[in-house]
């Protein structure tokens, strides 16, 4: 016997996902697979899917937080596409990022041009004071 075999072998540690190692909720492994299958580049580095998953998770959290605020402002407990639309269009940076995106069932932002509003007369100005 050469002493090789199953005796004294190392105990294998429990598998830990790359998402949990990075402290993310989004799937790093899936993002890596999609980057490889998408023919974006011949090779994909180990850090690229972690970074991309982190960016996607941050953007999602930001949009959901603003949409949740919009839902609460409308006295609703469920986020609907209208709340997503209001959240994105009222935020300057998100609106710039998603400017060309159409959200189904999102509606439009309420907006009335100033020239179309009724003009204030002298009697109305006196009443308001």
From Swiss-Prot:
Modified residues annotated as N6-lactoyllysine in this record: 10
In-chain residues carrying the UniProt-annotated modification Phosphothreonine: 121
Native organism taxonomy: Eukaryota, Metazoa, Chordata, Craniata, Vertebrata
Tagged with keyword Nucleus: yes
Post-translational modification N6-acetyllysine, affected residues: 6, 10
UniProt keyword Flavoprotein, yes or no: no
Gene3D superfamilies per UniProt: Histone, subunit A
Record field: compositional bias (Basic residues): 7-19
Family matches, as CDD domains: HFD_H2A
Spans annotated as Disordered: 1-22
Residues with PTM N5-methylglutamine: 105
Protein name, UniProt field: Histone H2A.J
Compartments reported by the entry: Nucleus; Chromosome
Organism, as annotated: Macaca fascicularis (Crab-eating macaque)
Subunit composition and interactions: The nucleosome is a histone octamer containing two molecules each of H2A, H2B, H3 and H4 assembled in one H3-H4 heterotetramer and two H2A-H2B heterodimers. The octamer wraps approximately 147 bp of DNA.
Residue pairs linked by disulfide bridges in the UniProt entry: none
Keywords: Acetylation, Chromosome, DNA-binding, Isopeptide bond, Methylation, Nucleosome core, Nucleus, Phosphoprotein, Ubl conjugation
A single cellular component GO annotation: nucleus
GO terms for MF: DNA binding; protein heterodimerization activity; structural constituent of chromatin
């Amino acid at each position: 016997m050469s002493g090789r075999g199953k005796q004294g072998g190392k105990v294998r540690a429990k598998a830990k996902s790359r998402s949990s190692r990075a402290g993310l909720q989004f799937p790093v492994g899936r993002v890596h697979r999609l980057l490889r299958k998408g023919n974006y580049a011949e090779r994909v580095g180990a850090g690229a899917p972690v970074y991309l998953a982190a960016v996607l998770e941050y953007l999602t959290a930001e949009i959901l937080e603003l949409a949740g605020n919009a839902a609460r402002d409308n006295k609703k407990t469920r986020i609907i596409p209208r709340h997503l639309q209001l959240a994105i269009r009222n935020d300057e940076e998100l609106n710039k990022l998603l400017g060309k995106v159409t959200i189904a069932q999102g509606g439009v932002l309420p907006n009335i041009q100033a020239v179309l509003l009724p003009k204030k007369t002298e009697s109305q100005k006196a009443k308001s004071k």
